[in-house]
């Protein structure tokens, strides 16, 4: 399982750990990933995702998982999230 957010694509970054004497050694900055279960109102079921804490705040801000996925770009989403987005869009188109 990769250390990548399924909704925003946020991943591991690399940088330097700098000591007092200014020696630099490599380090990794890990994203704050959480395993969450989100409810899709359109599909009427819950979905398990591994997303960053920042993405969780964005989902809540936009009004839920469905609204977030409809607005999200395809390039940042994982394969699982892309399939969810397509399902939601199909269901919304059928309801309209």
Curated annotation (Swiss-Prot):
Molecular function per GO: structural constituent of ribosome
GO biological process, one term: translation
Alphabetical keyword list: Ribonucleoprotein, Ribosomal protein
Record's GO cellular component terms: cytosolic large ribosomal subunit
Record keyword Isomerase present: no
Annotated InterPro entries: Ribosomal_bL28, Ribosomal_bL28/bL31-like_sf, Ribosomal_bL28_bact-type, Ribosomal_bL28_sf
Protein family per UniProt: Belongs to the bacterial ribosomal protein bL28 family.
Name under which the protein is recorded: Large ribosomal subunit protein bL28
Organism field: Methylobacterium sp. (strain 4-46)
């Amino acid at each position: 399982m990769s250390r990548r957010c399924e909704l925003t694509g946020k991943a591991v970054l690399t940088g330097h750990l700098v000591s007092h004497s200014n020696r630099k050694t490599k380090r990794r900055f890990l994203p704050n990933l959480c395993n969450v279960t989100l409810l899709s109102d359109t599909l009427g079921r819950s979905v398990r995702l591994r997303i960053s804490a920042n993405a969780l705040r964005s989902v809540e801000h936009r009004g839920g998982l469905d609204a977030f996925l409809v607005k999200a770009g395809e390039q940042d989403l994982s394969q699982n999230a892309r399939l969810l987005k397509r399902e939601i869009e199909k269901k919304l188109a059928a309801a309209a």
